[in-house]
């Protein structure tokens, strides 16, 4: 799974441990709770009447708390002529609300000493923050305002769009990043899995404030959303606070595209000026949940997971053919 962290502007692959499998709770009519004894030690879960699922792990030895809100609003859900919208929207969500200007919002987050950010991936959008444990209530209040009442001001949209367009140009100028985009597009031809999080210059330039709001209204709903908390916090108090802040939230996002591609073997070359050549090969990999998933993950790590991997030792150290070589996997594309 490829994820783009807007806080650090870096590309990384999410591990299986970071993934939360969502269960459809749109038909729930009452809240339900699961204690840590029914799950793993120190874990708890609560489902609110509106379908919002909350999970948590108490870690009393820590002085901080990290929480994240994951929504069923991924890159695959973007309209074909609005590629890059989810990335732009997740940046815009922090640019002021109906109750706080962008300056007020920024100052309040800074007063908390919060590290916050957003991520966009094929299947979801995620917002997260790390704060001192005794400031969780205030941080949740800010995030509720951000998610439920975004202002999406035009002036900030123009600035965020310019930043995203610059990032697109920068990515196209970096051969290593570009080759991953190219193999993804060729392997997943005519599938939402082929999309780039940043979109294209043409589509990003065309996205309007109304487009952002329409997508937010269509897909930012509690049913299918997961709120997770880990660190030094009181579970019961957190459940009560989340219920106060998000209890009036309603609705469910429409079903996402699920059609899988059927890639065919091919070879393609894109000439580019420069002294380096970049080669990438892509193969089918067992999906997360497949009986062979973990075995394939281990094999991939042995084959190309670091400086002790077989690829590194044979191709770089022994033969001196390359500067860098690696193997990796993405369980959902």
Residue ranges and their predicted role:
Residues 2-31, 43, 47, 55-58, ...:
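Charge-rich, well-structured scaffold segments of protease-associated domains
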Residues 57-59, 68-70, 254-309:
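His/Glu-based metal-binding/catalytic segments typifying zinc-dependent metallopeptidases
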Residues 44, 65, 125, 277-281:
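Short beta-strand micro-motifs in enzyme catalytic cores
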Residues 36-38:
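Short loop/turn motifs at secondary-structure junctions and domain boundaries
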Residues 61, 66-130, 306-321:
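M16/MPP (pitrilysin/insulinase) zinc-metallopeptidase core fold and M16-derived inactive scaffolds
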């Amino acid at each position: 799974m490829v994820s783009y962290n807007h806080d650090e502007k870096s590309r990384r692959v999410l591990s299986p441990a970071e993934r939360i499998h969502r269960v459809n709770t749109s038909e729930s009519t009452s809240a339900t709770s699961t204690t840590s004894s029914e799950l793993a030690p120190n874990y708890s879960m609560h489902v609110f009447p509106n379908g919002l699922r909350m999970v948590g792990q108490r870690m009393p030895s820590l002085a901080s708390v990290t929480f994240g809100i994951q929504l069923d609003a991924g890159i695959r859900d973007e309209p074909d002529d609005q590629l890059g919208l989810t990335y732009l929207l997740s940046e815009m969500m922090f640019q002021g609300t109906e109750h706080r200007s962008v300056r007020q919002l920024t100052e309040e987050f800074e007063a908390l000493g919060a590290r916050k950010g957003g991520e966009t991936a094929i299947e979801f959008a995620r917002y997260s923050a790390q704060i001192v444990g005794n400031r969780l209530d205030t941080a949740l209040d800010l995030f509720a305002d951000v998610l439920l009442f975004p202002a999406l001001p035009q002036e900030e949209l123009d600035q965020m769009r310019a930043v995203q367009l610059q990032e697109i140009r920068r990515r196209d100028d970096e051969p290593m990043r570009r080759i991953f985009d190219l193999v993804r597009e060729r392997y997943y031809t005519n599938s939402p899995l082929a999309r780039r999080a940043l979109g294209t210059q043409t589509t990003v330039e065309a996205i309007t404030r109304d487009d952002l709001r329409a997508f937010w209204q269509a897909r930012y709903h509690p049913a299918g959303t997961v709120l997770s908390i880990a660190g030094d916090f009181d579970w019961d108090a957190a459940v009560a606070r989340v219920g106060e802040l998000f209890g009036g939230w309603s609705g469910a996002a429409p079903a996402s595209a699920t059609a899988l591609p059927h890639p065919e073997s091919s070879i393609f070359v894109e000439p580019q000026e420069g002294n380096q050549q970049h080669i990438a090969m892509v193969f089918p990999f067992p999906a997360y949940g497949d009986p062979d998933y973990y075995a394939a993950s281990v094999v991939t790590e042995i084959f190309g997971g670091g400086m002790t991997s077989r690829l590194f030792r044979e191709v770089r150290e022994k033969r001196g053919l390359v500067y860098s070589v690696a193997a990796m996997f993405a369980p959902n594309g």
